[in-house]
Amino acid sequence: MTKISMVENAKVTACKLVGASIFVEAVISGRWRDKIESIRRTYQMTMEQAGGDSKRASAAISRIKRKLPAVIWAGEFSKREANGLKEYSGLLVIDLDHLGTKLTKAKEKLSSDPHVFACFVSPSGNGLKAVFNVPSDIERHADAWATAAKRVESLTGIKPDHGNDVARLCFASHDPEAYHNPHAVELEIETTPTLEEEKPT
């Protein structure tokens, strides 16, 4: 089973290992349900008070959200820093935020992609986390992220948030209808040309 790293909350740097599929199953089964439902109530209440301003609502839950457990999909880390990576998992996460009415359709599109290992609703209830299976080569992580982000935009018409940091945190969530495909097909990476490789126009 593919292993990823988990921290108790955003302030903690010490990591422990957890199976990637075990984490997804915990999102589905409701391990963090009470905490997530409380966060989503705060988010919705702020949305109503702020006239539908999702950015203000996100700011309102930011401090609470950072108390949640979180994983680093990229693999096994000795500490929560890029230089703490011990073994690359070949999994990376793409974030889609502030989706509103676009969420359901976007989730359907992403869940139909053979390269998606998991797709679930974020803690706010207004975003998605899409986890892709990519080649297990840390040297190609940036290109892998760019390829996955491009694919997400092609599938959904929505530009993902930029976040190719190999030690990027993904907070625990609750989604009984999360998509999970432990046999996701590895995504072929498109290599970004270097300055030397780029041809003059």
Regions found by a protein language model. Name each.
Residues T2-G19, S78-T101, V134-T201:
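DNA replication initiation modules
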Residues A82-E87, S111, C119-S124:
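Short glycine/proline-enriched loop/turn "hinge" motifs that connect secondary-structure elements
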Residues M1-G90, E196-T201:
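DNA replication initiation on ssDNA origins
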Residues Y43, I64, L110, P114, ...:
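Hydrophobic, Leu/Ile/Phe/Ala-enriched alpha-helical segments that form helix-helix packing faces
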Residues N126-N133:
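A generic structural motif
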Residues L92-D95, A118-V121, K129:
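Structural recognition of the beta-strand scaffold that forms the well-ordered cores
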Residues H98-V116:
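Short amphipathic alpha-helix segments
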Residues A118-S124, P160-D165:
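Short beta-strand
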